[in-house]
Amino acid sequence: MEGLLSIIIPSYNEGLLIDNTANVVVDIMTEHKIPYEILFVDDGSKDDIWNRIQAASKKHEHVRGVHFSRNFGKESAITAGLTYAKGDCCVVMDCDLQHPPIKIVEMYKLWQEGYEVVEAVKEDRGEESGIHRFMANTFYKIISKLTNIDMMNASDFKLLDRKVMLVLLNMKEKNSFFRALSSWVGFKTTQIPFRVAEREAGESKWSTKSLIKYAILNITSFSSAPMQIVTICGFIMLLISVIFGINSIVQYVNGTALGGFTTVILLQLFSSSIIMICLGIIGYYIAQIYDEIKGRPKFIVSEEC
């Protein structure tokens, strides 16, 4: 089965990588005679990446580009790629070539065999700082528990059949999590391993702050489980109150003086902290609902090439 392959490459401030990435992918696709298009999605970058994408589009007839009016985030860039892709199937990959393009050939062959989702699974996480690795492992352990999907070595490097692309695009939620949703939808799926390569140039745009924000957003957008923390905390506070109440009654019956300015203050501080945490969790979900009902687009395209 032959079919057009759309290679979607979200990009943000990675102008130095565009030429090499385009050349490498074009050479591999040409060598293996795979009908393809490359779709760069510029996520409102501040460097000269859009000029480089336009130049690559003029140099290579199969290279296209989409330019956002501002930065909307990687998830929105992936959604835009799925929207503008013309292929019978698509591959989503990073611009820095840490997702080895040669693996696309293997993924395409598996699609030809009838698989509708081909997931590239990390054999290792490559070179990362200790805190980055710890946070990533913690996040994926949590999301795996919440979704009952093994996300420990998952990546955005995936091939999707056109029908899977359409299913994802029909999900109208504003805050989507592509890595989890593309597994959650099901379909005939297989996996291939890959080793994370070193970046060709530049540095990762993910800071500790952005990773934490990304983790919280995706956990709350994909699962309501954190809301159960509020209920659990309520039961814990009730249990503590009952224990202290019984203790106070016993002391009163025994004629023991009830002590306790320090105890009262500590209990108030503890209960207030729990209440504030619970309100924060509820508030985050309310903010998510607010984002959904505003009905704003997930991205705005200012230019195409």
Model-identified regions with their sequence ranges:
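N-proximal low-complexity "stem/linker" segments adjacent to membrane-targeting elements
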Residues: M1-D27, K33-I34
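Donor nucleotide-sugar binding loop of glycosyltransferases
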Residues: E14-L17, S45, P100
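Short beta-strand/loop segment that forms part of the nucleotide-sugar
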Residues: A22, I34-S45, V66-H67
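A conserved acidic beta->alpha catalytic loop
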Residues: D42-N51, L97-Q98
